[in-house]
Amino acid sequence: MASQGTKRSYEQMETGGERQDATEIRASVGRMIGGIGRFYIQMCTELKLSDYEGRLIQNSITIERMVLSAFDERRNKYLEEHPSAGKDPKKTGGPIYRRIDGKWMRELILYDKEEIRRVWRQANNGEDATAGLTHIMIWHSNLNDATYQRTRALVRTGMDPRMCSLMQGSTLPRRSGAAGAAVKGVGTIAMELIRMIKRGINDRNFWRGENGRRTRIAYERMCNILKGKFQTAAQRAMMDQVRESRNPGNAEIEDLIFLARSALILRGSVAHKSCLPACVYGLAVASGHDFEREGYSLVGIDPFKLLQNSQVFSLIRPNENPAHKSQLVWMACHSAAFEDLRVSSFIRGKKVVPRGKLSTRGVQIASNENVEAMDSSTLELRSRYWAIRTRSGGNTNQQKASAGQISVQPTFSVQRNLPFERATVMAAFIGNNEGRTSDMRTEIIRMMESAKPEDLSFQGRGVFELSDEKATNPIVPSFDMNNEGSYFFGDNAEEYDN
């Protein structure tokens, strides 16, 4: 990362803005949120959704996916050049659920992409409002992070499934820009780089010619993004090596896996933002809330306040537990998939249980599932306290973590010891220590080994009462350290499949 002077807050990345003061940032983020809300209201009108149907999270997701698809330039171009049978490149759609005679029914809708782009631009003062689209992508990414595990993807790139806490944002599309890069975990970017290097090993022309030059620029840019996430000089120096390599190959892959592992203890900076489903913003706009005038922040109290008084419903499969479905969506709303469960439980005011103990599958419903057998219930998305979202990743304390996930990536800026099993992490570092990065590796391992509990617990602000909007009276919770800290412990979550 360049000097502090050029660092932009993520609200600025979010809105594509240059340096702004806090009020301007709040206003431009508010403008973006208001645009999403207005778009949602208009789509509900066009689709003739009742108030209840418009509050159904499954309908919200379908509408969100339609607008993302309508603006996916590269895919649209590809579809037009490679027509496939039965797919109209100019149309997009999905399942809309309607309540008919006391039963839920699924209706597959098709819409002109051009029409959706028109509605979106109209809701956003005639602009393309890319920031709003990215915001929706991050909400979908956070939902995926809470719902699925990425074991297969980790194993395929040579990483260890226990490193799942580094995989935030692993399903974000490439076009998600700076705001998307800010929320990606160290493992996610390492994995993208490893995939590039593997393609280069298998395809001699990958780095050659005009295309290869562009590829190289993308490679170096991604290296710089990853470098900017590390907080120690040795980790950054190692990233310089990876970036400057003439012909990236297995040595670089090794280095990247090493660096990703080191991030379990020497954590990277990963931003967290509360991105809510479009229907929540729609409800607020419909009730007269002026986001641009009031201002909005993705990392402060605002999303908590919004969720305190929004009623959102979800379809529930016959054997699912509605409380567990609520937990899943709550975690997604606050980007808390890799947060310590004790911290999440304290803030939420309800026990947050590990993924393996949840009796619920994902929020989205497959086309072959029988909707008539399903009921809908209110999602409980309220919280007892609020806390500022972190972007630092903090550092760690030697606490027991679990077999399934051996570290956490803090979401909330709350002081605590971090659960994590030093022995398990350090065991991964025996073996290969020669080659051009050996001195950096030695230095990194030394830092990891000497990490002392007291200087390394996460120094956060604490949590706040919901009435304490200016964050004046921090409450520092005390946690029972014998409790389970990780969400993906002993896990049986489904794999994420594109």
Curated annotation (Swiss-Prot):
GO molecular function list: RNA binding; structural molecule activity
Gene Ontology terms: biological process: symbiont entry into host cell; viral penetration into host nucleus
Chain residue ranges for the region called Disordered: 1-22
A Pfam family per the record: Flu_NP
Biased composition (Basic and acidic residues): 8-22
A cellular component annotation (GO) from this entry: host cell nucleus
Superkingdom to which the source organism belongs: Viruses
SUPFAM superfamilies on file: flu NP-like
Keyword list, A-Z: Capsid protein, Helical capsid protein, Host nucleus, Host-virus interaction, Ribonucleoprotein, RNA-binding, Viral nucleoprotein, Viral penetration into host nucleus, Virion, Virus entry into host cell
Position of the signal peptide: none
Motif (Unconventional nuclear localization signal): 1-18
Residue positions of motif Bipartite nuclear localization signal: 198-216
UniProt main location, coarse: virion
PTM section of the record: Late in virus-infected cells, may be cleaved from a 56-kDa protein to a 53-kDa protein by a cellular caspase. This cleavage might be a marker for the onset of apoptosis in infected cells or have a specific function in virus host interaction.
Localization, UniProt: Virion; Host nucleus
Stated role: Encapsidates the negative strand viral RNA, protecting it from nucleases. The encapsidated genomic RNA is termed the ribonucleoprotein (RNP) and serves as template for transcription and replication. The RNP needs to be localized in the host nucleus to start an infectious cycle, but is too large to diffuse through the nuclear pore complex. NP comprises at least 2 nuclear localization signals that are responsible for the active RNP import into the nucleus through cellular importin alpha/beta pathway.
HAMAP family found in the cross-reference section: INFV_NCAP (MF_04070)
Family note: Belongs to the influenza viruses nucleoprotein family.
Subunit details: Homomultimerizes to form the nucleocapsid. May bind host exportin-1/XPO1. Binds to viral genomic RNA. Protein-RNA contacts are mediated by a combination of electrostatic interactions between positively charged residues and the phosphate backbone and planar interactions between aromatic side chains and bases.
Protein name: Nucleoprotein
Lineage: Viruses, Riboviria, Orthornavirae, Negarnaviricota, Polyploviricotina
